[in-house]
Amino acid sequence: MRSDSIKKGLERTPHRALLFATGIPKSEMNKPFIGVATSFTDIIPGHISMKELERFIEKGIHTGGGYPFFFGIPGICDGIAMGHKGMKYSLPSRELIADIIECIVEAHQFDGIVLLTNCDKITPGMLMAAARLDIPAIVLTAGPMLAGYYKGQRRNLTSDTFEAIGKFKKGVLTEKDLEALELCACPGAGSCQGMYTANTMACVTEALGMSLPGTAATPAVMSEKRRLAFETGVKIVELVRKKINARQILTKEAFYNAIAVDMALGGSTNTVLHIKAIANEAGINLPLEVFDEISRKTPHLVNIIPSGEHYMEDLYKAGGIPAVLKRLKDKIYSNPTVSGIDIKEIAQKAEIYDENVIRSIKKAYHKEGGVAILKGNLAPDGAVVKQTAVSSKMLKFEGIARCFDSEENAMKAILDGKIKEGDVIIIRYEGPSGGPGMREMLSPTSAITGMGLNESVALITDGRFSGGTRGPCIGHVSPEAARGGPIAIVKDGDKILIDIPKRKIEILISESEIKKRLKNWKPPKQKIEKGYLLRYARNVSSADKGAILE
């Protein structure tokens, strides 16, 4: 066992002394040492239930014949970090999480690891660590939040708080409504209720084979989640004994399966960044084109908020990810999972309990999957759009550029009523390096939707979008503005063409004019002059490469 390097032999006398100082009984010293990376915090709703899950994981590890050691991992709530300086730290925290887990696991030579996670950048950071370390590993996502209720209707974070700001400015909602929605939109523990980034990544994790069947959609408050936590603890010891390492599960086929499930769910565009980053750690190259190829062949079968009317709890009741896999059984590859059951067998045995929530391929919401990859002279290296959240009338759109060099300036213009029908909002210098941190533009997109402009105004950015975004919102524009991408030289009044079916994004000026503007462009001064973000800005790759550190 790996842990023998810290507990066996004469030279390890001081190591054993320190281990005994923790209270470990001598009888447990020959058991596999299991690290449990817990991201519990009481500021993220999706993580407040983890203390109880920790206890069930612990019981499971003991039952399986291992000995657990818990250690803490930081987490950021993207919703609370949204719309201000804090969002600059969200994506960079993904790399920190992976690095911290690597440091702790290697320093203490754990035999296997349980990764307790739930929200946006924490889950991919943990999966990156698992792929990098290539030891036995299993993920437990803590589960989605239930719907809130107000005036007899189901409520959720995005449409009933973020979009409510625009509705209030337009006079659709009263101040009393806003105050009430603040108190009831998010009723308790769990990741936010829709197919936003946290829940999409939980579904991707299960489709990768890195969590037990049923884990992703089971709500945080269900007793079933505790049983899954217990089984996760039992299973990690089995994985250690069978010497099944993470990369035996994280194969190219696993990533193709995960992308297919993501496309069928109409998931968050952030998964493009995260799946690429995880694959990179596993030594697998996933070009952007792979996402588009799989999307073109995978129908959109599940329509959960923000693009649809269903909630994560509906997906749970309908059969969860195993049921989605059943729909896709002819489109996925055979591959092992942490459960010990092949993903194809999980799909075969699954039951579908609601045909309206998980549609058949013949009755798909859309013939293609959730994400489309666009290219053109505005984004030579690619851009990403959630095409299933765009109305049919906006799939092809030509508009006039309105340029802003920060999210804040764009947000002010939107709320001040300065954005009109036919405008294409350009938000730049918000990329991985230029931001730095590639902030999510949920506040501007929600304001656009709340003010009723989501079918007449488009938004293009080198930043990102929350999984809660809907409408013609194109992000991850590469190269980014700060590194001389063409988005940097767009001017107010330029005509912009978006053609999602043809995968085009163009600035309608001559090639000679583009070259002239690029020649005259000068990079702006770095916004950050110290700390982690400065190091991140200097070393982060472009979005088309997953915004990984190089």
From Swiss-Prot:
Mg(2+) binds at D78, D120, K121, E440. The modification N6-carboxylysine is found at K121. Its EC number is 4.2.1.9. InterPro entries: Dihydro-acid_dehy_C, DihydroxyA_deHydtase, DiOHA_6PGluconate_deHydtase_CS, ILV_EDD_C, ILV_EDD_N, IlvD/EDD_N. The keyword Transferase does not apply. Its cofactor is [2Fe-2S] cluster; Mg(2+). GO terms for biological process: isoleucine biosynthetic process; L-valine biosynthetic process. [2Fe-2S] cluster binds at C119, C192. It catalyses: (2R)-2,3-dihydroxy-3-methylbutanoate = 3-methyl-2-oxobutanoate + H2O; (2R,3R)-2,3-dihydroxy-3-methylpentanoate = (S)-3-methyl-2-oxopentanoate + H2O. The keyword Kinase does not apply. Binds 1 [2Fe-2S] cluster per subunit. This cluster acts as a Lewis acid cofactor. It comes from the Bacteria. Keywords: 2Fe-2S, Amino-acid biosynthesis, Branched-chain amino acid biosynthesis, Iron, Iron-sulfur, Lyase, Magnesium, Metal-binding. GO terms for molecular function: 2 iron, 2 sulfur cluster binding; dihydroxy-acid dehydratase activity; hydro-lyase activity; magnesium ion binding. GO terms for cellular component: cytosol. Pfam families: ILV_EDD_C (PF24877), ILVD_EDD_N (PF00920). Pathway: Amino-acid biosynthesis; L-isoleucine biosynthesis; L-isoleucine from 2-oxobutanoate: step 3/4; Amino-acid biosynthesis; L-valine biosynthesis; L-valine from pyruvate: step 3/4. The active site is at S466 (proton acceptor). Homodimer. HAMAP family: IlvD. PANTHER family: D-XYLONATE DEHYDRATASE, D-XYLONATE DEHYDRATASE YAGF-RELATED. Functions in the biosynthesis of branched-chain amino acids. Catalyzes the dehydration of (2R,3R)-2,3-dihydroxy-3-methylpentanoate (2,3-dihydroxy-3-methylvalerate) into 2-oxo-3-methylpentanoate (2-oxo-3-methylvalerate) and of (2R)-2,3-dihydroxy-3-methylbutanoate (2,3-dihydroxyisovalerate) into 2-oxo-3-methylbutanoate (2-oxoisovalerate), the penultimate precursor to L-isoleucine and L-valine, respectively. Belongs to the IlvD/Edd family. This is Dihydroxy-acid dehydratase. The lineage of its organism: Bacteria, Pseudomonadati, Nitrospirota, Thermodesulfovibrionia, Thermodesulfovibrionales.
